[in-house]
Design a protein with these regions (language model features):
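Divalent metal-coordination and catalytic microenvironments
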Residues: 9, 29, 50, 61, ...
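Histidine-rich, glycine-flanked metal-binding segment
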Residues: 1-7, 11-56
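Extended hydrophobic/aromatic segments used for targeting, binding, or gating
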Residues: 199-209, 214-246, 392-450, 456-458, ...
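Active-site neighborhoods of metal-dependent hydrolases
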Residues: 128, 132, 136-163, 169-190, ...
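Hydrophobic, small-residue-rich alpha-helical packing segments that form membrane-like cores
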Residues: 90-99, 111-242
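Acidic, glycine-enriched loop/beta-strand segments at the rims
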Residues: 11-23, 354, 381-393, 440-449, ...
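C-terminal cap of metal-dependent C-N hydrolases
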Residues: 9, 312-315, 397-407, 413, ...
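Metal-associated gating/positioning segment near the N- to mid-region
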Residues: 40, 47-119
Length: 526
């Protein structure tokens, strides 16, 4: 007898091959049998007639490290069909960190990760993974946080890793890889990551390469103080060449400013591949992104960590210098920022900085810094979408063209904090699998599922997931290919998709007729 029998569905197995009609039997946390099972018994039978049965989606880039620890149900991801997430992105995470450094990092990252419990053990990758294993609704994978390594080696300071400090970081990284990390994640536009040198990264990536892991990088592309040229791509390629590590580029896509220029975006990556660097990429299917307001401050302000930052924000002379620097930041202009997460001022969530500044009779620079002080740095924002509908449509089409490449995968870059988060937190996967697939008809549904499931599983070494196959874990999403669609918008972002009635995680029904069941069956993987 099976624990669960999925009857009458059409299976898309994730490998890219043509769909086929079949039943599927589950025992425990694994797929036991695929075939004609109409005469078989099961404790639970799910009628999937007229529906697609596919592997659960794997979110290749999510910022849920903190949120999952305060909201383990994680409906915003689960209702999209996401069964596994790669955490630790952009080097912005919590392990390995001592108690004191975790406390500091917890506050520093509160605008992007929220505030997880203060008493957690984050001293190693093993300890980090234990905080999630069978305690949250989805599976989690973790690349070692570059920011955490730097904090443990030299504190929150603009100091290069050399000699003993570099060896200490390499030792922590090696231990993390042995404890199940899938690689090393850096955010070269964020701190303390941005203070690293290319040589430091090459040495760290030699450790990752030896362990078979992946170098996951958000490039040095939006930090005006530490730019590299070429959007940071040449640095990542150089690291791949000299260390032998596999390179994964985070959210690589066009925007309203360069819509349609796909070849221009990928030229340096493709040249790196020709030169022998193993590269993959990922994106989210929206024209603008979101992050935490603290990250927009100039590099020197971050020196010393959160308490020192707040001191600088309050000092009149230093404050003026910061505001002058913010006025020059064209990558994240304050006038385009919609504040999405303000725990102490929720009445202003969903409003732009200029709108709030007008209400408070302040300049936009003063308003931004005052909000950081009032919120103890816990401020999130997203950039306003383009008003040019043609540019928006072109960016959406570009996303599908990018994703038609076999080296691409999908990652939400989700930050589900506040009352008005970026809509990608609730809509990324049904937008890709449903809305944009139907609108642009660039890929078959089989190819779409491969990008959403098997590609990230293969890239990050997540074994026995990403496909519907006997002996694989029963991470499964059942959906209507004609109805699946996102409903989250910039104006009304906390809206769940439709057309996804069932989601299973490790053989447990986690979404049942579009309702989350409250089962925490997620594993720390691989």
């Amino acid at each position: 007898m099976f624990d669960i029998l999925i009857h009458g569905g059409t299976i898309i197995d994730g490998s890219g091959v043509t769909r086929f009609k079949s039943d599927l039997g589950i025992k425990g946390d694994k797929i036991a049998t695929i075939g004609d099972l109409k005469n078989q018994q099961a404790k639970r039978i799910i009628n999937a007639t007229g529906l697609i049965v596919s592997p659960g989606f794997i979110d290749a880039h999510a910022h849920h490290d903190g949120v999952l620890l305060t909201d383990p149900q994680h409906a915003s991801g689960l209702r999209q069909g996401v069964t596994t997430e790669i955490l630790g992105q952009d080097g912005l995470s919590y392990a390995p960190l001592s108690k004191e450094n975790y406390k500091m990092q917890r506050q520093y990252l509160s605008g992007i990760l929220g505030l997880p419990p203060e008493n957690l053990d984050m001293s190693s990758v093993k300890a980090f993974r234990a905080n999630y294993h069978k305690k949250v609704s989805i599976n989690t994978a973790y690349p070692v946080s570059h920011g955490a390594l730097r904090m443990e080696a030299v504190g929150f300071h603009d100091i290069p890793l050399t000699g003993k400090t570099l060896e200490h970081a390499k030792s922590l990284l090696s231990e993390g890889m042995e404890q199940g990390a899938v690689g090393l994640a850096t955010g070269m536009s964020y701190h303390p990551n941005a203070w690293s040198t290319t040589e430091e990264l090459i040495e760290l990536c030699k450790v990752v390469a030896k362990a078979g892991g992946v170098y996951i990088t958000h490039l040095r592309d939006v930090n005006p103080d530490r730019g590299y040229g070429g959007g940071g791509i040449p640095e990542a390629i150089e690291i791949g060449k000299r260390s032998g590590v596999k390179v994964h580029f985070s959210h690589t896509r066009t925007s309203a400013e360069n819509a349609g220029k796909i070849d221009e975006v990928l030229e340096l990556v493709d040249q790196g591949k020709k030169d022998g660097v193993d590269c993959t990429l990922e994106l989210y299917p929206y024209p603008t992104g979101s992050t935490f307001l603290l990250s927009s401050l100039p590099s020197w302000v971050h020196e010393g960590g959160p308490d020192k930052i707040i001191e600088k924000l309050k000092d009149k002379t230093t404050r003026t210098k910061i505001i002058d620097a913010l006025a020059l930041n064209t990558k994240r202009p304050l006038h385009d920022c919609v504040l999405s997460h303000l725990p102490n001022n929720p009445q202003f969530e969903g409003m732009t900085i200029p709108e709030i500044a007008e209400i408070k009779n302040k300049s936009i620079g003063d308003l931004a810094l005052d909000m950081l002080i009032e919120e103890n740095l816990q401020v999130g924002f997203w950039l306003s979408p383009p008003t040019n509908i043609a540019a928006w449509r072109q960016v959406s089409k570009d996303c599908m063209e990018f994703l038609s490449r076999p080296d691409y995968m999908i990652g939400s870059d989700s930050i589900p904090l506040g009352s008005t988060p970026h809509p990608r937190a609730y809509g990324t996967f049904p937008r890709f699998v449903g809305r944009l697939r139907r609108q642009f008809d660039v890929m078959s549904l089989e190819q779409v599922i491969q990008r959403a499931a098997d590609n990230p599983a293969q890239r990050f070494g997540i074994s026995k997931r990403g496909r519907i196959q006997e002996g694989y874990y029963a991470d499964i999403v059942i959906f209507d290919e004609d109805r699946i669609i996102d409903t989250a918008t910039y104006d009304d972002p906390k809206q769940f998709p439709v057309g996804i009635p069932y989601v299973l995680v490790n053989g447990s029904v986690s979404v049942d007729q579009e309702i989350c069941t409250g089962i925490f069956s997620g594993y720390a993987v691989p």
